[in-house]
């Protein structure tokens, strides 16, 4: 426990150094939400529950930024700086190392949720029962494991430059095609077919089913679990093969 606490203190210091990045990861989705939701604020025949659903979309967008940029970047930096090798020669085990990374990311997730939810409620008047707010936050955190799996897979790339390029393409592609920026019903049929196969779309389906019907979307849940498990398993296998080569 003491070693895990010490690692978390280090993570906190690193977070302070990357404060500008964290402000952007929360600030940009919040700005998008205020801009696009403002277009529908005074529209009587606007889409039902648009303010609420777009609030959830932009929260997921913010969390995806943390999982696909901050998480892999930190792991890659630790690797090239030999921090991971150093820890292997100390009493700290790698499970504690990864737990500290996950803890740091969970804190980032909670900050994203708190900020974007607060803006939606206080500025745009989004109102839900307390149970719905808590349930939506919980499902966002659990569902975002799929993005963590993607971020971990990015660490297999040989350079930080390539990791950044591929990460940006995935980030924007998943956001647009998966329906975080706009409903995929506006897309041609072939683009809709692609969008429905993406984790961003399935995460939003999970949230919409919970908020609209109070239940769990089983197909979306299974998709996210299988997607995450396959990527985690593939990454662990390839990383092990790479280290033993």
Which functions belong to the PLM regions below?
Residues 4-16, 206-207:
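A short amphipathic helical element positioned immediately N-terminal to and/or at the very start
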Residues 94, 102-166, 215-225, 230-236:
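Alpha-helical transmembrane segments and their short interhelical loops
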């Amino acid at each position: 426990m003491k070693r895990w606490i010490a690692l978390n203190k280090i993570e906190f210091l690193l977070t302070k150094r990357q404060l500008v990045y964290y402000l952007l990861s929360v600030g940009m989705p919040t700005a998008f939400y205020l801009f696009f939701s403002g277009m529908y604020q005074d529209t009587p025949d606007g889409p039902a529950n648009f303010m609420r659903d777009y609030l959830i979309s932009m929260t997921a967008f913010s969390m995806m930024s943390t999982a696909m940029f901050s998480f892999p970047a930190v792991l890659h930096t630790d690797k090239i700086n030999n921090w991971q090798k150093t820890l292997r020669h100390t009493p700290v085990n790698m499970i504690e190392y990864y737990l500290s990374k996950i803890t740091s990311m969970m804190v980032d997730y909670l900050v994203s949720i708190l900020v974007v939810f607060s803006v939606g409620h206080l500025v745009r008047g989004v109102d839900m029962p307390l149970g719905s707010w808590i349930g939506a936050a919980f499902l966002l955190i659990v569902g975002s494991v799929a993005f963590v799996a993607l971020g971990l897979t990015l660490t297999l790339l040989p350079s930080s430059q390539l990791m950044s390029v591929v990460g940006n393409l995935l980030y924007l592609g998943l956001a647009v095609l998966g329906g975080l920026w706009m409903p995929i019903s506006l897309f041609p049929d072939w683009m809709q077919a692609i969008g429905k196969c993406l984790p961003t779309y399935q995460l939003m389906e999970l949230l919409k089913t919970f908020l609209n019907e109070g239940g769990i979307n089983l197909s979306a849940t299974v998709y996210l679990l299988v997607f995450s498990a396959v990527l985690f398993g593939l990454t662990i296998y390839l990383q092990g093969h790479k280290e033993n080569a």
